[in-house]
Amino acid sequence: PDWDLFESGSLYRPMQGKIWRAVGFETQRGCPYTCTFCNSPSNNVEYKAETGGKFHRKKSIARMKKELDFLVKKYDPNLIYFVVDTFLAMSNREFDELKELYSDYKIPFWMNTRAETINEYRAAGLAEMNMLRMNIGIEHGNYDYRRNYLKRNVKNEVQIRAFQIAAEHD
């Protein structure tokens, strides 16, 4: 994206006790999950009705490189925000390709994901990539409520383990 329409001060964000020159970056659009509280499932339905295609789309590594090169050259950020509903909604192969691409930048970043997408392998990779912050959506502490009303069938043990893994790689 080109943010020249906005004042240059709009790039600055407070994060963890520091002011950062931050840019947002999309690796994918939409989300493959069907949580009841989110707009992505309805976007998926509307998009499919209108186009016959999937709303959840992933950018190619070549496209990501082109966009990152542009953002880094034009705005010289010292923080990247991956503007993605569930950053780790990708295969290990896709994660490895992204990790390889991002090794050229190593700019600290933050992102959002779900507990069940976090494992030792990915946490170690995120640390190598220079992750500053990870937001993990749990939405509710009660498993039955999560499963029955939010359609998030993720056991408490999985959620707790995700936070433990993240802490081990901090």
Tell what function each PLM region has:
Residues 2-169:
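Radical SAM [4Fe-4S] cluster-binding motif and immediate context
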